[in-house]
Structure formats: C-alpha cells, structure tokens
Amino acid sequence: MKDPKSHKLKFNHYLEKLYQSDKAMIIYKVDQGYDIYTDFSKRINLTKQNIHKFLNSFEKTTYKKQTDQYVGFFGYEILNHLLGIKINKQSKNGFYKGVFYKPETIIQIRDNISIFSNKKKQEFNKYFKPTKILSPFKLNIKYQKYKKIFDIFSKKIRQGETYQIKICTKYRNKSSINPINFFWRLMKSNASPESFMIRDKNYSIVSCSPETLLLKKGNKIITKPIAGTLRKSKKTNMSSALKFFRNNSKETKEHNMIVDMERNDLSRVCVPGTVKIDKEKYVEEYRHLFHYVTSISGSLIKDMTIKNIIKSMMPGGSVIGCPKIRTLELLNQQEKENRNIF
C-alpha cells in the first residue's frame, strides 16, 4: 500500500476490525507514534534449552524487508539463566519465560496509517471482551516476611556484599480485562516512552514503563537509567523536583550507583573511550511523578552480537540494584516467587 493518505478511512476500518478480533497482536510505542505487529508466522517460547540458539540465529539473518524481525519479551528468570546465575526453587505461576513473534503484518500509526503485509487476505473473528474487576487486589508477601528479607539485605549492604538491592512485590487480583482498551486508556493518561501491549490467546501483557533500558541506533547504543522518583503535588514543578533530587543524599547516591553500573555494562560491548554521559541527572515529568534520569551512550564494537548486548545490559540496574551478579544471587536466594515479566 504505497499511498497511506488515499487509504486512510479503509485503514482505520481495518484497525477497528483488528481491535475487535481475537487475533494475536503487539502494540509498541515509538517516538513518532505506534507500531502494531500481527499475523504472526512464528512464535518462539523461550526455554533454557533454546535461548542461546534463538539469539545466535540473528547473527546469520539477512534483513531484506520490514517484516524480517522478531518482537517479544524476555522474562527475568531466562535472563538469569543467560548470565549463568542459579535460581533457587521458587513458586511458579506457569507463565512463559519469554516469547518472541515473527510478524507478517506491521501497521505504523503516525500522522497517517501505513500497512506493510505479506498477507494477501485478512481474516477476522469478531471478539469483544469487556473489562470487569472480579476481586480486590492482594499483596503476594506479608509484612513480617518482607521485613525479614529487608533486614537480611540491610546486613548484606553493611557487609559490603551489595550496595543497592530492589525487593520485588506483586499485587494480584482476578479481572476480566480487554487489554487493547486498557492500553489505549493508559496512553491517554500516561503515555510513557517504553509502553507496549501483547495480546495472545492465553495471556496478555500491558506495560507503561518510563525507562529506556536499551536502545540501538545503527552502531550506537543508548540507555537511560532512572533512579529517583518524586510524587507530584500542587507545590512541585520541574525545578523544585530537580532541587529535591540534587539536595537529597539518598537519591543522589542511589542514582550515581546505578549510572556507574550501566556505564560499566555499556563498556563491555562498546569501543573503549566511546561510553559517555549525554545528559546527566535531569528530570522527566509524567502525570503523577517526576523521575531522575541520566542518558548514557556508546559506540558498539564491530560485529558485537545481540546475545552479548543482552547479557551485558539485562536485567537493568533500576529493577535489581548493584553490583549486578552478586545482587541477582542475593535476590534469588530470598525471593520465593518468580518475577517473570518484571
């Protein structure tokens, strides 16, 4: 479809049919708008047995057209396996360790709508799922258990085994959710940079993350760690938030630790001397919060593999702490439930 303008109404009708269908699809926010992926010809469920083969396959792939790509997610546990870190026995919820899809249709929503598809005929099964909250939210850990883990980690910090560590807690409930409606409602109220939605037959994910963990542009790689959060109020603005972060010893030290770790992670895959701070300790404003951010970049070593980039950069320091390896080991000793897509 070479002329998006002449097909605009038709494309909008197509999107409505897609949204109301039961087709698996992914929506991903980009700088200029949104990309939608669907008509998946392949679905790879990641396991300990196939993760290396999957990542290595990209080194032999030639990219001739827009649909020559995979889109999906890595779970926390599969990234630990990739790093060779053992996870103690935990309670599991049966969720996937990671899933990647090969799309045959990509829809770009910009000022106009463009469709790139290898499919000649589109078929839709009409389907609509209303959103209903069926039970109240519950926390997955009791206060005394959380305090016990907190005290153990406090001791580890005093002993110098870790400098910063992030305990994971989950809220859960039973709901019937239309993930597409839910995603677009979030985008109206809080369109964060790393927002996406996955809808498949047996699961959905809706994410609205402000943090850019990993962005590759040509041979340049960028990360924007967030360490520092302030709730918005009528008395706070960008200037007062920046002043708060700069004058707060705790926030500054935590931020510096994460930035140092991310710079070190980048240096593993970048040309020596190219890792630099592009913008240091600035504030990003969202609907309910201010975040303390630093932007870091580097030039990738020639022929650096995707697998090595992922091993170096994931999981991000803002969700685990630092230093990376020892902190992951400590978390895995104490957390009794899988993080999955955390």
Located regions from the model:
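Extended alpha-helical targeting/anchoring segments
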Residues: 1-342
